[in-house]
Design a protein with these regions (language model features):
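C-terminal luminal/periplasmic domains and tails of membrane-associated envelope-modifying transferases
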Residues: 1, 388-565
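Interfacial juxtamembrane loops and adjacent helix segments
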Residues: 35, 56-112, 253-266, 414-427
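Short hydrophobic alpha-helices at membrane interfaces in multi-pass membrane enzymes
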Residues: 11-14, 135-141, 173-195, 307-313, ...
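Transmembrane-lumen/periplasm boundary regions of multi-pass, lipid-linked membrane glycan transferases
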Residues: 66-69, 79-81, 195, 208-301, ...
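Membrane-interface transmembrane helices that cradle and orient dolichyl/undecaprenyl
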Residues: 2-3, 129-131, 135, 170-188, ...
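Transmembrane-helix motifs of polytopic, lipid-linked glycan transferases
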Residues: 14, 18-21, 98, 102, ...
Length: 565
């Protein structure tokens, strides 16, 4: 029978989980039916490609857990839709995706983002309660539920949020293994380790720390037995990874070549970069400072766990000093550990002050985290500048007009003419079964839609070996190329890297050969800046909080120019 204390504890837990859910689920429809997150199509398109070319994803930059998990979700959606008469066959399923991918992205964002995000909050509570105390568990979950970095990334389809859940479970199961070295704890730790690495390879960064702490910190087994135990864990983990990601081994050459190429995208960022940018914006200085105090205080009560958390944070952060990209999501694995340490620190510090002061300070800490998340959700609910711009184009520019854009992503996602789509069949990549089928469906949809002759500025030569298939045709960045296609309008967004396109625009504007006919700003009316403060949040919403609060909507600053004949 549950006591009043149990009932109160459950009410608090459910309240925190409800808060975590609301902060993550509100706004998950942002941009749809257009996709305004650069990385989401990577997962979604490779997921749907399984239906055309089989289980080998032919994509190994990310492990396949997210792809296979999403495929199962789509399979359930297809079966349910077919039984209800929504889909007649796989072709109609694909046509539905290309006509309006809203349902597909909502499914992905909910299950890979929201669901795994809330589950991670719950699991952190569970781990903290088992290995620390109830107060630490409550504050851990509370701090994590309002963590801007985790809440914002939980709106997206990508591998990071499942990774965080598996890392929290992996951390908890390691503590279980340390305290009770027996078969069930070894298996649990091994399974979560295998799943974590199958979500994202960076989970492996935590293994050297776990191995050394188990080998030299665990006192319940002789040294030789500890080696055998961890060898067993390694074998089971590898087996779990192989089950989830079999083509890592079956297509080893393809895997190796992609991973080797990806290493060029990561490099040295500086010692304090991720601290000042990713963690300061994503977790917040109050939580970071509380975490430091918490680790210090934890040394007096849970010395092994304090040292473990500190070592995990420092080792993971240290690797990302030298091998990382500038995006905040690379620090997501540290967020639950910092929230746990901060919760312990708050539990200790809070005992030394009065009730009023304690509640007031806690409220300020929470507001500092929750207000950015709430404002982000508000922005997610508003129209993106690309949507506003597209509405203007549909009302003011004739279908079939020749439009040139400086970016396929940072400008409105307009539909190309059937003739332009037809020309893609002869380009590199079109022979891929999934892409060929997509072209067939795109051409079918374009026949009944509002289409434009779209060109994308690029320094690459527009031949079969250049650029991405669905960005083509490409256009050299010069005035002669514009004249050659009889360009009628230029669409300039100020978030791409095509600086030469901006220079050309300035030259033509100064020469009186362009006329500005419309502009669309994401910023407040008093803010006329075209380029964003946050130079690295180029996937979806801002990560820099200054950039966030400057905005009245998401999206780039856009300008449309009419080319004078």
């Amino acid at each position: 029978m549950r006591t009043d204390t149990d009932q109160k504890r459950l009410m608090v837990l459910w309240g925190i989980l409800a808060l975590a859910f609301l902060l993550r689920v509100v706004g998950i429809g942002f941009g749809l039916p257009h996709v305004y997150h650069q990385d989401e199509p990577v997962v979604v398109n490779h997921t749907l490609a399984i239906g055309a070319r089989g289980w080998n994803p032919h994509f190994f930059v990310l492990p396949p857990f997210s792809i296979y998990f999403l495929f199962l979700a789509y399979a359930v959606y297809f079966v349910a839709g077919k039984s209800l008469g929504i889909f007649s066959d796989a072709s109609s399923f694909g046509t539905a995706f290309l006509s309006d991918p809203t349902a597909f992205y909502l499914i992905g964002r909910f299950f890979l983002g929201v669901a795994f995000g809330v589950l991670a909050v719950y699991w952190l509570y569970r781990v903290a309660r088992r290995h620390f105390n109830e107060k630490t568990a409550v504050y851990s979950a509370l701090f994590f539920s309002v963590c801007y970095l985790h809440a914002s990334q939980s709106h997206y389809i990508y591998a990071d949020i499942p990774l965080v859940f598996f890392l929290v479970a992996m951390f908890g199961s390691f503590l279980d293994l340390y305290e009770e070295p027996e078969p069930k704890t070894r298996i649990a730790f091994a399974v979560f380790t295998g799943l974590a690495v199958s979500a994202k390879y960076t989970a492996a960064y935590f293994l050297p720390v776990d191995f050394l702490f188990y080998l030299f910190g665990q006192k319940k087994e002789p040294f030789s037995q500890k080696l055998v135990s961890f060898l067993t864990v390694g074998i089971i983990s590898l087996a779990v990874f192989a089950v989830v990601a079999p083509y890592t081994f079956l297509s080893w050459h393809e895997f190796y070549s992609q991973i080797h190429a990806q290493t060029g995208a990561e490099g040295f960022l500086g010692v304090v970069y991720h601290l000042r940018y990713s963690l300061a914006n994503g977790v917040g200085w109050p939580v970071i400072l509380l975490a430091a105090a918490g680790i210090y205080a934890m040394m007096f009560f849970y010395r092994f766990k304090a040292r473990l958390i500190l070592a995990l944070c420092l080792f993971y952060y240290g690797i990302n000093i030298f091998f990382s990209q500038p995006f905040t999501r690379y620090m997501l694995p540290l967020a639950p550990l910092l929230c746990l340490a901060a919760a312990f620190g708050w539990g200790v510090i809070g005992q030394g002050v009065g009730t009023f002061v304690r509640r007031a300070v806690l409220m300020l800490i929470l507001l500092g985290s929750v207000l950015p998340v709430l404002y982000l959700d508000i922005l997610f609910l508003r129209k993106d500048t690309r949507d506003v711009c597209q509405n203007w184009i549909d009302k003011n520019i004739q279908p079939g007009s020749v439009l040139v854009r400086d970016s396929a992503f940072w400008t409105p996602h307009l539909m190309q003419t059937p003739e332009q789509i037809e020309n893609k069949y002869g380009m590199r990549g079109a022979d891929d079964p999934a892409k060929h089928k997509r072209l067939d469906l795109m051409k079918q949809i374009a026949k009944n839609g509002t289409t434009y002759n779209l060109f994308t500025f690029s320094e690459a030569k527009d031949d079969a070996d250049a650029g991405f298939l669905f960005q083509k045709p490409l256009l050299p960045i010069n005035e002669a190329a514009l004249k050659n296609i009889n360009a009628q309008y230029l669409i300039i967004g100020y978030s791409s890297n095509e600086v030469k396109a901006w220079d050309l625009k300035d030259q033509l504007l100064a020469a009186g050969k362009l006329e500005l006919v419309a502009s669309f700003s994401p910023y407040r009316t008093s803010d006329k800046k075209k380029e964003q403060v946050d130079k690295f949040s180029c996937t979806a919403a801002p990560d820099d909080l200054v950039e966030l609060f400057r905005r009245q909507r998401l999206g780039p600053y856009l300008e449309i120019f009419q080319v004078k004949s």
